[in-house]
Design a protein with these regions (language model features):
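Short active-site neighborhood of thiol/selenol oxidoreductases, capturing the structured segment around
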Residues: 12-16
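C-terminal scaffold of the Radical SAM
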Residues: 2-11, 29-56, 60-324
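Local cysteine-cluster metal-coordination motifs and their immediate loop/turn environment
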Residues: 17-30
Length: 324
């Protein structure tokens, strides 16, 4: 195992907050805009906030970069390239750094993916969520299974590494149905799967529908059975869990996920992004403004969009470390 795989690492998280549509289960910081987003304005804001972060972190060797959202695949490849150039200007990026971009199957085009690859992206994470058209409609996804399979094939032929997400413990889902879907997913996956139980989050459309009795989720016993099945099937097929929801072939674990789980340092740039890094020897937390346009305005005024944060005490650090 190389040093880059052993160390906690230093990560950069970039939040692109825009989506084509808001999924009914999602409580992430994502926003729909019906007019084109001024991507150049955001590129300038990302560059300014990164320069601010560099002044606070000092020199670091970046081992992972993660474009999350939102839907980062709505960014033009040139936008991704410009953001990566800003990261390179502020820190040294390891030659073996993992650079991941989240994408939705509905926004996948071969030429666009080649553009991301040429910009420097070497890993893609697809929001597939289900391999069943009825459940995709229930989840409010804009793609169907055929589009998902096509996106997976394009991603596998374009990037060295691929992951995709599935949501399970969906209403009415049986162990037999989930086992078959999981088996198909493992056959399609290159080396990594992120498998999440459906949770009903307050403030989402699903929360209101669930409260109104419009649908039911599996009871805790049934959900636990689906979780056990998930662990058994993935382990038997060579993709054991390396943390709660992520499964990988040995050596294909997400380095950026491991930054979090190994209590490494990372900076977060963009609307709503969080960071945790050492500043003057103390572990510092930063939290950025969530609303995209307000974040941009703050960066333009102050050089950053950070609105909250703290320096952790030793006891707080110890508590966080134990939770990892």
């Amino acid at each position: 195992m190389s040093d880059i795989d052993r160390s906690p690492g230093f990560g950069v998280y970039v939040h692109w907050p825009f989506c084509a549509a808001k999924c009914p289960y999602c409580d992430f910081n994502s926003h729909v805009r019906h007019q084109p987003v001024d991507q150049q304005r955001f590129v300038r804001a990302f560059a300014a906030e990164m320069a601010h972060m560099r002044a606070r972190t000092g020199p670091r060797a970046v081992t992972s970069i993660f474009f999350g959202g939102g839907t980062p695949s709505l960014m033009e490849p040139a936008t991704v390239g410009a953001i990566l150039e800003s990261i390179n200007r502020n820190w040294s990026v390891d030659d073996r750094a993992e650079i991941t971009l989240e994408a939705n199957p509905s926004s996948v085009e071969a030429e666009r993916f080649r553009g991301y690859r040429d910009a420097g992206v070497n890993r893609v994470s697809l929001g597939v969520q289900a391999l069943n058209d009825q459940d995709l409609r229930f989840l409010g996804r804009l793609h169907d299974v055929a589009e998902a399979r096509r996106a997976i094939e394009i991603a596998r032929s374009t990037f060295g590494r691929l992951s995709f997400d599935l949501i399970y413990a969906r209403p009415g889902q049986t162990p037999e149905a989930w086992g078959a879907e999981l088996d198909e997913a493992i056959g399609l996956a290159a080396d990594h799967l992120s498998l999440y139980q459906l949770t009903i989050e307050q403030g989402t459309p699903f929360f209101a529908l669930h409260q109104a009795g419009k649908f039911a989720v599996p009871d805790p016993g049934h959900a636990a059975e689906l979780y056990r099945l998930t662990q058994e099937v993935t382990a038997a097929r060579g993709l054991p869990a390396y943390e709660i929801s992520n499964h990988a072939r040995p050596g294909a674990e997400s380095r950026h996920n491991l930054v979090y789980w190994r209590y490494g340092e990372y900076v977060g740039v963009g609307p709503g992004a969080h960071g945790r890094f050492l500043e003057d020897g103390a572990r510092t937390v930063t939290i950025a403004e969530r609303l995209p346009e307000k974040w941009c305005a703050l960066v333009e005024e102050n050089g950053h969009g950070i609105v909250d944060g703290e320096v952790l005490s030793r006891s707080q650090e110890a508590d966080e470390f134990l939770l990892m």
